[in-house]
Amino acid sequence: MAAKGAREKIRLVSSAETGHFYTTDKNKRNMPEKMEIKKFDPVVRKHVIYKEAKIK
């Protein structure tokens, strides 16, 4: 039986407090720290920082 993969599903939540989020996955071995990335928030129609959160 194969081992579990290192990739984990995460949720990127908008820092503009609009409730908008993106879902993606990341490799925990290569990037153990929390992910922060600048993406477009369609609610405020601007690029804002999205921070990693766990998928519930």
UniProtKB/Swiss-Prot annotation:
Highest taxon above the source species: Bacteria
InterPro entries, A to Z: Ribosomal_bL33, Ribosomal_bL33_CS, Ribosomal_bL33_sf, Ribosomal_zn-bd
Family the UniProt entry places it in: Belongs to the bacterial ribosomal protein bL33 family.
NCBIfam families from the UniProt entry: PRK00595.1, rpmG_bact
Organismal lineage: Bacteria, Pseudomonadati, Pseudomonadota, Gammaproteobacteria, Pasteurellales
Gene Ontology cellular component terms for the protein in this record: cytosolic large ribosomal subunit
Keyword Ribonucleoprotein: yes
Protein name as annotated: Large ribosomal subunit protein bL33
Keyword terms, alphabetized: Ribonucleoprotein, Ribosomal protein
One GO term of the biological process aspect: translation
GO-annotated molecular function: structural constituent of ribosome
Keyword match Ribonucleoprotein: yes
Species the sequence originates in: Mannheimia succiniciproducens (strain KCTC 0769BP / MBEL55E)
HAMAP family noted in UniProt: Ribosomal_bL33
PROSITE patterns registered for this protein in UniProt: RIBOSOMAL_L33 (PS00582)
